[in-house]
Amino acid sequence: EDLRNVTPPKVSLFEPSKAEIANKQKATLVCLARGFFPDHVELSWWVNGKEVHSGVSTDPQAYKESNYSYCLSSRLRVSATFWHNPRNHFRCQVQFHGLSEEDKWPEGSPKPVTQNISAEAWGRADCGITSASYHQGVLSATILYEILLGKATLYAVLVSGLVLMAMVKKKNS
């Protein structure tokens, strides 16, 4: 391998599609590490500071883009509810095994040593208002209003009856 071409990866994290969340109630985050050489990398997923393995699917090996460039992708699938919690923190970490201290490197440019490169995202809050939930809310509010109106009317009739009885009793005495 040509040590002059040693290059660390550029890591990107892509958030789940709204269509997948709506149709499948699942959320797939995609991590893409590109432009690295050589292909000595390890990719891991971290959620809320802990490494996770469940729901992870990583390419079996890095794909060669050109003579001195590789790429690797990985997916993390979680429930839509878990994704919609803004307290959840997702991180894709790529450990790049670059040059060792003994390897010669020209002075004046940064030496690509072994390092961790990450991309991260936070869960996205979803207000959850759909057409169906909006209509259900309007219906519930209407029913509640009618109950309160009926209760107020019943109270008014009851108070009026008591006042009328008190007036009749006072008139007769």
Curated annotation (Swiss-Prot):
Keywords: Glycoprotein, Immunoglobulin domain, Membrane, Receptor, Transmembrane, Transmembrane helix
A cellular component annotation (GO) from this entry: alpha-beta T cell receptor complex
Organism: Mus musculus
Topology in the lipid bilayer: Single-pass membrane protein
Localization of this protein: Membrane
Family matches, as PROSITE patterns: IG_LIKE (PS50835)
Family annotation (InterPro entries): Ig-like_dom, Ig-like_dom_sf, Ig-like_fold, Ig_C1-set, Immune_Resp_Modulators
Stretches in topological domain Cytoplasmic: 169-173
Note: Clone B10.A was isolated from a cytotoxic T lymphocyte.
Transmembrane portions of the chain: 147-168
Domain of life from the UniProt record: Eukaryota
One of the Pfam families matching this protein, by short name: C1-set
UniProt name for this protein: T-cell receptor beta-2 chain C region
